[in-house]
């Protein structure tokens, strides 16, 4: 987690941390069709960012949850989208269009608020070295999830990859 947090702190300007996490949650959830899966994947990184900045932990987690719900609401592969379109006998494209008119304006307003809130954020000036090998499990989990792989298989692969890398780098114990 620390490697991914350090990578995020290096890539994103301080004032865009909140907006960046929100956009990432929106995109991931929209791509994989599950808000819960997105929350599970991003919350550890968000917690790490909150610990290294002055961002309140509950607020940072709320940013992840809000973005996750946005994407899940619009995703074509979300279980609720599939169930609702089948039971209501409507076309997914129509549901997407109508939901977009509702949630996209709200997301734009929220994004503006996060950008404004981010103006007061300062990250530590000394960012630890990024251990690139420890970022690999996140890339694999996000990549396989976005590719549409079964959620349980994605989680198993993520756990195994993390375990192997953790043992290889001596990160356990």
Give the positions of each predicted feature:
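Transmembrane helix-loop junctions in multipass membrane proteins, especially transporters and channels
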Residues: 34, 38, 84, 115-123, ...
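Hydrophobic transmembrane alpha-helices of multi-pass solute/ion transporters
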Residues: 1-16, 126-127, 139-173
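Transmembrane alpha-helix interface/packing and boundary motifs in multi-pass membrane proteins
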Residues: 23-35, 66-72, 143-149
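Membrane-embedded alpha-helical segments and adjacent helix-loop junctions characteristic
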Residues: 1-50, 173
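Juxtamembrane and boundary regions of transmembrane helices in multi-pass small-molecule transporters
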Residues: 66-69, 73-128, 133
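Generic alpha-helical transmembrane segments of integral inner-membrane proteins
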Residues: 23, 27, 104, 108-112, ...
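Transmembrane helix-bundle signature of multi-pass membrane transporters/permeases
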Residues: 22-26, 44-45, 64-69, 99-104, ...
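Alpha-helical transmembrane segments of multi-pass membrane proteins
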Residues: 15-27, 54-71
């Amino acid at each position: 987690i620390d490697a991914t947090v350090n990578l995020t702190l290096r890539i994103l300007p301080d004032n865009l941390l909140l907006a960046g996490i929100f956009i990432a949650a929106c995109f991931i959830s929209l791509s994989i069709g599950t808000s819960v899966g997105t929350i599970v994947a991003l919350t550890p990184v968000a917690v790490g960012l909150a610990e290294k900045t002055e961002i309140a932990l509950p607020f940072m987690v709320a940013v992840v949850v809000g973005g996750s719900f946005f994407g899940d609401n619009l995703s074509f592969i979300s279980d609720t989208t599939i169930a609702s379109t089948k039971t209501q006998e409507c076309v997914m494209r129509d549901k997407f269009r109508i939901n977009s008119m509702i949630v996209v304006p709200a997301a734009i307003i929220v994004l503006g608020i996060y950008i404004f809130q981010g103006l007061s954020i300062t990250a530590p000036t000394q960012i630890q070295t990024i251990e690139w090998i420890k970022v690999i499990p996140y890339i694999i989990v996000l990549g396989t999830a976005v590719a549409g792989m079964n959620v349980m298989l994605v989680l198993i692969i993520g756990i195994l990859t993390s375990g192997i890398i953790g043992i290889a780098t001596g990160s356990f114990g």
